[in-house]
């Protein structure tokens, strides 16, 4: 009798454990409960209209976006916790994303970096799932895909595409996981404290991946690139043509840890930009043909990886989605 009960308990535990991991590769092809919808048969035909309809409410809100390419330029400034969901057959990867928000304008044309952004997030507590954000301008000028200028922002299995200044991680605490970021020149830049985990960071031209703008010793911001894959865009030969970063401001602070650095990374690793800069650039336990640090410039030593708490704050588990 006791043996039968034990077997039943073990079976129940096994089933429960299996059920816990099954949702990790499930799709999202219909709106979660309570979400407004965007699409040809949705509540709204544009994402902008759905955002406008939120008004001045402070309640938690969510918007589900059906498959499609949306030619829009969006400013998100909502007083409550807002979640944007893109339609997908696999929530854990950007590779099955079906929703793209795109706009094409350069910073000189728009009048500022922020005004060139396809999506500009100004409000705290925004979570974005399975959405591609692109600025189609290409080379020749700065042209931002995303401005992330708020606190406690999370991006899950998203894509950000541009050429120069793709992702403006401007301020606040930010979390990027299972995502893809593409560009050539300074394509992750700003002064946010941002954690990038299990991301594909893709160079489509010669240049610099990061341009961090920390400039005071009291500024706690980091860029932490953790367990990421650095690579060249398909069909582009960039051997030795890509630097891990250069300082937009004098005390830039960036670490690459447990990441794959291929032969596109220049042996010097890092580059200069801001006059008088004394950046804090670190590398820890990386692999790949570009991970040899013997010829590095501007590299500081570090004895341990940087922790999420250091980058995102001790309370990060309260706002980061732990299912990723």
Swiss-Prot record:
The gene is pmeA. It holds the Pfam family Pectinesterase. This is Probable pectinesterase A. One of its GO terms (cellular component) is extracellular region. It is an enzyme of class 3 (hydrolase). It is found in: Secreted. Glycans are attached at residue 285. Pathway: Glycan metabolism; pectin degradation; 2-dehydro-3-deoxy-D-gluconate from pectin: step 1/5. The lineage of its organism: Eukaryota, Fungi, Dikarya, Ascomycota, Pezizomycotina. Residues 1-19 form the signal peptide. It comes from Aspergillus flavus (strain ATCC 200026 / FGSC A1120 / IAM 13836 / NRRL 3357 / JCM 12722 / SRRC 167). GO terms for molecular function: pectinesterase activity. The keyword Disulfide bond does not apply. Its main location: secreted. The record marks 164 as: Transition state stabilizer. Its EC number is 3.1.1.11. Substrate binds at residues 142, 246, 248. One of its GO terms (biological process) is pectin catabolic process. InterPro entries: Pectin_lyas_fold, Pectin_lyase_fold/virulence, Pectinesterase_Asp_AS, Pectinesterase_cat. Involved in maceration and soft-rotting of plant tissue. It comes from the Eukaryota. Belongs to the pectinesterase family. It catalyses: [(1->4)-alpha-D-galacturonosyl methyl ester](n) + n H2O = [(1->4)-alpha-D-galacturonosyl](n) + n methanol + n H(+). The active site is at residues 165, 186. Keywords: Aspartyl esterase, Cell wall biogenesis/degradation, Glycoprotein, Hydrolase, Secreted, Signal.
């Amino acid at each position: 009798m006791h043996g039968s009960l034990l077997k039943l308990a073990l079976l129940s535990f096994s089933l429960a454990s299996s059920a816990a991991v099954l949702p990790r590769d499930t799709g999202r092809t219909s709106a979660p409960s309570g979400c407004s919808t965007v699409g040809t048969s949705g509540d709204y035909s544009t994402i902008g209209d759905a955002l406008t309809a939120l008004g001045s409410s402070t309640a938690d809100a969510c918007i589900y976006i059906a498959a499609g390419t949306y030619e829009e330029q969006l400013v998100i400034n909502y007083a409550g916790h807002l979640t944007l969901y893109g339609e997908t057959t696999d929530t854990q990867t950007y590779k099955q994303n079906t929703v793209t928000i795109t706009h094409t304008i350069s910073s000189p044309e728009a009048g500022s970096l922020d005004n060139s952004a396809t999506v500009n997030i100004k409000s705290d507590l925004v979570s974005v799932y399975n959405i591609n954000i692109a600025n189609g301008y290409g080379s020749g000028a700065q042209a931002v895909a995303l401005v992330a200028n708020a606190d406690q922002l999370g991006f899950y299995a998203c894509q950000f595409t541009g050429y120069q200044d793709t992702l403006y991680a401007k301020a606040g605490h930010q979390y990027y996981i299972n995502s893809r970021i593409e560009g050539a020149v300074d394509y992750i830049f700003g002064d946010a404290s941002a954690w990038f985990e299990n991301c594909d960071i893709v160079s489509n031209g010669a240049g610099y991946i990061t341009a961090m703008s920390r400039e005071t010793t009291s500024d706690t911001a980091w860029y932490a690139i953790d367990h990421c894959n650095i690579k060249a865009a398909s069909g582009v030969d960039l051997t030795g043509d890509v630097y891990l970063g250069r300082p937009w401001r004098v005390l830039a602070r960036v670490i690459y840890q447990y990441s794959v650095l291929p032969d596109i990374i220049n042996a010097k690793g890092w580059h200069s930009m801001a006059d008088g800069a004394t950046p804090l650039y670190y590398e820890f336990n990386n692999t790949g043909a570009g991970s040899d640090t013997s010829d590095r410039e501007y590299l500081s030593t570090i004895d341990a990886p940087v922790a999420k708490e250091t980058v995102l704050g001790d309370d990060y588990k309260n706002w980061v989605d732990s299912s990723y």
